[in-house]
């Protein structure tokens, strides 16, 4: 999978019923985040935290959906553990992928993987630790891949969403460590002539190729 490609569509069972992925996304943004196996410690903390901050994603018109290489029944049992240990049960669907179809479709597992998922260990599925941000156009905007031992920073994913949505709308780029409200950079695809029309007050330019303006509202 590469940034800019169309996210593969699929049908799958989830903890909230069967979905067709592209139809489920609709006109929203979406985050698909995957897990190597149910009842694993790091992922338990992640699923609980995503439930806690889901209102922040909803405020940004972003739907979130999990995936784990187990059955929907296992997911529902796991959800009880998540609520009891993290204080928040998943309030978003989790895809059941016991036949590895979605994991293989997205290149998270080799095409020749087969067999009973219950006989596989988390280490067997170690590559299923990805985050995909998908736009309303169904294109992949961002991919993050984490090792099993490092919990994902979903506050950072919120920051990334803010940057992706801002830059998609205004033809700007966000500099290092940017946060909402900070100055931004006029995209290189915008000529100086066009930039003068967009930013009649001008811009700061420590170099001709670094054109800094306040964040567009």
Per-segment meaning from a language model:
Residues 1-217:
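Chalcogenol-based redox active-site neighborhoods
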């Amino acid at each position: 999978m590469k940034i800019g490609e169309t996210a593969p569509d699929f049908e799958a069972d989830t903890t909230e019923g069967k979905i067709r992925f592209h139809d489920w996304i609709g006109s929203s943004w979406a985050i698909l985040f995957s897990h190597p196996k149910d009842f694993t410690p790091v992922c338990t903390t992640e699923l609980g935290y995503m439930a806690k901050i889901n209102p922040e994603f909803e405020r940004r018109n972003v739907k979130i959906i999990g995936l784990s290489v187990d059955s929907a029944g296992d997911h529902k049992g796991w959800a009880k553990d998540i609520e009891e240990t993290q204080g928040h049960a998943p309030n978003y669907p989790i895809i059941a992928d016991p036949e590895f179809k979605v994991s293989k479709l997205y290149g998270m597992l080799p095409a020749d993987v087969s067999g009973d998922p219950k006989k596989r260990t988390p280490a067997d599925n170690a590559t299923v630790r990805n985050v995909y941000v998908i736009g309303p156009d169904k294109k992949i905007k961002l991919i993050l891949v984490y090792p099993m031992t490092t919990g994902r920073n979903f506050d950072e994913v919120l920051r990334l969403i803010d940057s992706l949505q801002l830059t998609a709308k205004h033809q700007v780029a966000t500099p290092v460590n940017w946060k909402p409200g900070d100055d931004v950079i006029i995209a290189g695809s915008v000529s100086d002539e066009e930039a003068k029309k967009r930013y009649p007050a001008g811009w700061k330019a420590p170099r001709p190729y670094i054109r800094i303006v306040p964040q567009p509202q």
